UniProtKB/Swiss-Prot annotation:
Its main location: membrane. Belongs to the binding-protein-dependent transport system permease family. This is Putative 2-aminoethylphosphonate transport system permease protein PhnV. CDD domains: TM_PBP2. PROSITE patterns: ABC_TM1. GO terms for cellular component: plasma membrane. It comes from Salmonella typhi. Probably part of the PhnSTUV complex (TC 3.A.1.11.5) involved in 2-aminoethylphosphonate import. Probably responsible for the translocation of the substrate across the membrane. The keyword Lyase does not apply.
């Protein structure tokens, strides 16, 4: 503990609680109240209704939910596959080479998502790899944005697996493929599932790049929320935000529970 005195720890706890309430709880509470409000002309809503949630689960909003889940799972699974492959491949190199190659994987996380979206839009709007107006361009953008986090988490998991375990399997005659399937991947599985949860949450909430490249029929929840609030439909946008937060949290909790069970 950096704070040794009981009074100091109590004060730090109070400050942390106040900051949590002000910057996390209150905004969500306001969004929830807005999603349930009939009219909000004063300090508090003057009436409550569930119509905004009904709107959030029908029509274009429901299509946006399905699109977000489809894009999120597809991009996250592909990023996980590539992240595991890259992390395993980098183990064959020296420390200095690993450092420089890791920087290449971390680079997308340092670039604003709007810049990533613009770059992908320009790169894949013409030529043999034209993807503009298709689902593939959205999947590409989401993959680029979450791949760095996937690689980082999987690399951390690999670093915590003792090399002695694989060496013992090798000394017993296990082939590299057998070691990978029956030793390395099972030990890495909790990290992989945990990373899948993180990637899915990042993809579900992505807006900056998606709003520049999404094709008709593949409007995601963040884009739908932005469109609703931009048109002044705050209540429906708030209801859709609550749906997005709830589904993302439920998926993360389920995947984290699976990860703990595997661990």
């Amino acid at each position: 503990m950096l704070i040794w005195s009981p009074k100091g720890r109590a004060a730090a706890g109070v400050v942390a609680s106040v900051l949590f309430i002000v910057f996390f709880f209150l905004p969500l509470a306001v969004i929830l109240m807005s999603s349930l409000s009939q009219r909000w002309n004063g300090i508090l809503p003057s009436g409550f209704t569930l119509n905004h949630f009904v709107n959030a689960l029908h029509g274009a909003a429901w299509d946006a939910l399905l699109a977000s889940l489809t894009i999120g799972f597809c991009a996250s699974l592909f990023a996980l596959l590539c992240g595991v492959w890259a992390a395993l491949a980098l183990r064959q190199y020296g420390v200095k080479t690993q450092k420089w190659l890791s920087m290449v994987f971390y680079l997308p996380s340092a670039i604003p998502s709007v810049s990533v979206g613009l770059g992908i839009l320009v790169a894949f709007s013409q030529g043999p790899l034209q993807m503009n107006g298709t689902l593939w361009i959205v999947l590409t953008a989401h993959f680029v944005l979450i791949s760095a986090f996937t690689f980082s988490n999987v690399s951390t998991g690999l670093a915590r697996i003792s090399a002695d375990i694989e060496n013992v399997a090798s000394s017993l005659g296990a082939s590299p493929w057998y070691r990978l399937r029956h030793v390395t991947l099972p030990l890495l599985m909790p990290w992989m599932v945990s990373e899948l949860a993180l990637s899915l949450s990042l993809s579900m909430g992505e807006l900056g790049a998606t709003v520049m490249i999404y094709p008709p029929g593949w409007t995601t929840l963040p884009v739908a929320i932005f469109s609703l609030t931009d048109r002044g439909n705050i209540a429906d946008g708030a209801a859709l935000t609550i749906v997005l937060v709830a589904i993302t949290l439920l998926l993360m909790m389920k995947l984290e529970r699976i990860a703990k069970r595997l661990g």
